[in-house]
């Protein structure tokens, strides 16, 4: 996963088990999943508090709360250093199993990863022994070529499974930062997922236009571009994934 297609306009690599991240969704039926195409929150009416309008909050203030809601993370002014929830808060057993990124204009697949099957994981654990990293699966590191920063729309397809509980109002908020500057906020509704289902969604990233100076700095400073992906069920934070990015691949 280190830019295996040298002819691609922008290649990517990932290190680590892979916290999966994303944008607009297309759900298609797979093992009981829901078939639907959902748009990002833009003009849809919603409560004013959900806009994140108000004084900025700190990570420490959110960690002190019993329940973290969408309006809280929308008021963060910088990327988090810690996880805002525990793995065991995912009481719905939502598990991301496959991830693919493609350039929507050309259809070129830039990156693809799949989670090992259960038998492979058990074999690795037996061979490795020792303590299990509780953050495994919550962080991913990407390396793209500089050309990635000039793409306009990228599709990120994710496949995920749901446990034996129904999942209602499943929502993701993903915030991308370069250093202390918020580049883009993505906000998407997955809607309802039936129990014991396998769901596939394509999230469409519409990237902001960046100045040449910002692009140069992002290329020259790998992994200073970072993101938080917050997942909510019924407006309660249940999962938090993190990622960082380099844009100097192939150099």
UniProtKB/Swiss-Prot annotation:
GO cellular component terms listed in the entry, alphabetical order: ciliary transition zone; cilium; cytosol
Effect of mutating residue 207 to A: Reduced binding to myristoylated proteins
InterPro entries linked to this entry: Ig_E-set (IPR014756), PDE6D_unc-119_myristoyl-bd (IPR051519), PDED_dom (IPR008015), PDED_dom_sf (IPR037036)
Cell location: Cell projection, Cilium
Modified residues (N6-acetyllysine): 24
GO annotation, biological process: cilium assembly; lipoprotein transport; nervous system development
One MF term in the entry's GO annotations: lipid binding
Coiled-coil residues: none
A Pfam family it matches: GMP_PDE_delta
Modification sites for N-acetylserine: 2
Keywords from the UniProt entry: Acetylation, Cell projection, Cilium, Cilium biogenesis/degradation, Lipid-binding, Protein transport, Transport
Ranges for region Disordered: 1-28
Binding residues for tetradecanoate: 142
Entry function: Myristoyl-binding protein that acts as a cargo adapter: specifically binds the myristoyl moiety of a subset of N-terminally myristoylated proteins and is required for their localization. Binds myristoylated NPHP3 and plays a key role in localization of NPHP3 to the primary cilium membrane. Does not bind all myristoylated proteins. Probably plays a role in trafficking proteins in photoreceptor cells.
Domain remarks: Adopts an immunoglobulin-like beta-sandwich fold forming a hydrophobic cavity that capture N-terminally myristoylated target peptides. Phe residues within the hydrophobic beta sandwich are required for myristate binding.
Family named by the database record: Belongs to the PDE6D/unc-119 family.
Quaternary structure annotation from Swiss-Prot or TrEMBL: Found in a complex with ARL3, RP2 and UNC119B; RP2 induces hydrolysis of GTP ARL3 in the complex, leading to the release of UNC119B. Interacts with NPHP3 (when myristoylated). Interacts with CYS1 (when myristoylated). Interacts with MACIR; interaction only takes place when UNC119B is not liganded with myristoylated proteins.
Identification of the protein by name: Protein unc-119 homolog B
The gene coding this protein: UNC119B
């Amino acid at each position: 996963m280190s830019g295996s297609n040298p002819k691609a306009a922008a290649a990517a690599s990932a290190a680590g088990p892979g916290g999966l991240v994303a944008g607009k969704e297309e759900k298609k039926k797979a093992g009981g999943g829901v078939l639907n195409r959902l748009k990002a929150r833009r003009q849809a009416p919603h409560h004013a508090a959900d806009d994140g309008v108000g004084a900025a909050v700190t990570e420490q203030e959110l960690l002190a709360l019993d329940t973290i809601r969408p309006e809280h993370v929308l008021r963060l002014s910088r990327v988090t250093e810690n996880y805002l929830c525990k793995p065991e808060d995912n009481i719905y057993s939502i598990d991301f199993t496959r991830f693919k990124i493609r350039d929507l204009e050309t259809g070129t697949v830039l990156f693809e990863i799949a989670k090992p099957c259960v038998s492979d994981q058990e074999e690795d654990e037996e061979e490795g022994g020792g303590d299990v990293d509780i953050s495994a699966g919550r962080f991913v590191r990407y390396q793209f070529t500089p050309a990635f920063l000039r793409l306009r729309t990228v599709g990120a397809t994710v496949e995920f499974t749901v446990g034996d509980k129904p999942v209602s109002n499943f929502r993701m908020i993903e915030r991308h930062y370069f250093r202390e500057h918020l580049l883009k906020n993505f906000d998407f509704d997955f809607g309802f997922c039936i129990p014991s289902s396998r769901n596939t969604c394509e999230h469409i990233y519409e990237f902001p236009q960046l100045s040449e100076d910002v692009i140069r700095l992002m290329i020259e400073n790998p992994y200073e571009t970072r993101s938080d992906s917050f997942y909510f069920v019924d407006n309660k934070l249940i999962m938090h994934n993190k990622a960082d990015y380099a844009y100097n691949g192939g150099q």
